[in-house]
UniProtKB/Swiss-Prot annotation:
Keywords: 4Fe-4S, Cell inner membrane, Cell membrane, Iron, Iron-sulfur, Membrane, Metal-binding, NAD, Quinone, Translocase, Transport, Ubiquinone. Signal peptide: none annotated. The lineage of its organism: Bacteria, Pseudomonadati, Pseudomonadota, Alphaproteobacteria, Rhodobacterales. Belongs to the complex I 20 kDa subunit family. This is NADH-quinone oxidoreductase subunit B 2. It catalyses: a quinone + NADH + 5 H(+)(in) = a quinol + NAD(+) + 4 H(+)(out). Its main location: membrane. Its EC number is 7.1.1.-. One of its GO terms (molecular function) is iron ion binding. PANTHER family: NADH DEHYDROGENASE, NADH DEHYDROGENASE [UBIQUINONE] IRON-SULFUR PROTEIN 7, MITOCHONDRIAL. [4Fe-4S] cluster binds at C47, C48, C113, C142. It comes from Cereibacter sphaeroides (strain ATCC 17023 / DSM 158 / JCM 6121 / CCUG 31486 / LMG 2827 / NBRC 12203 / NCIMB 8253 / ATH 2.4.1.) (Rhodobacter sphaeroides). The gene is nuoB2.
Amino acid sequence: MSWTIGRPDAEAPEDRMAASHLFTRLDDLVAWSRKHSLWPFNFGLSCCYVEMATALTPVYDQARFGAEVIRSTPRQADLLIVSGTVFRKMAVPLYRLYSQMREPRWVISMGACANSGGMYDIYSVVQGVDSFLPVDVYVPGCPPRPEALMEALVLLQSKIATEARPLQIRMGETGPARPFDPVPRRDALREARMAVTRLADPEAT
């Protein structure tokens, strides 16, 4: 037991310590710092990239999310934003760029073409970037507005703040890795889509 001597009207040592110390878990502190310091690496392929470039203008103030510094190399980035149509010949370079990013790393799929192939249901277009990359947030639209990308950043920040991945990464053969099921969401929901026999009235919603 320790004793301290002070004036009766002086502030208690416990109160002084509470005012000058911050108590938190290390996982939460690391997640908080990472969610407010995203370093994006943009991979623009078609018209969705125009909307993404618009989101970088001062009108939308992407600096509010700590993601205004676009990196020129994937080795300095932890967020990959794929915007536009991903052709099969571009899938390999895109995967190489993703593999050069350090863990932890996140992926945003922006636009209908990146999400599911969009209107291009043909042999030369990848039907969803999630068939070879683990996507964290999907941004719908053709093309999506810059506000949709801002919402995606907010969703990604909330995901980063709650996940325990920053300090609990599973080690793979070549370095840190995380589980990834290479089944596109479009294929996973195919049976449910094919079972639909009646479409909802858009005027009723």
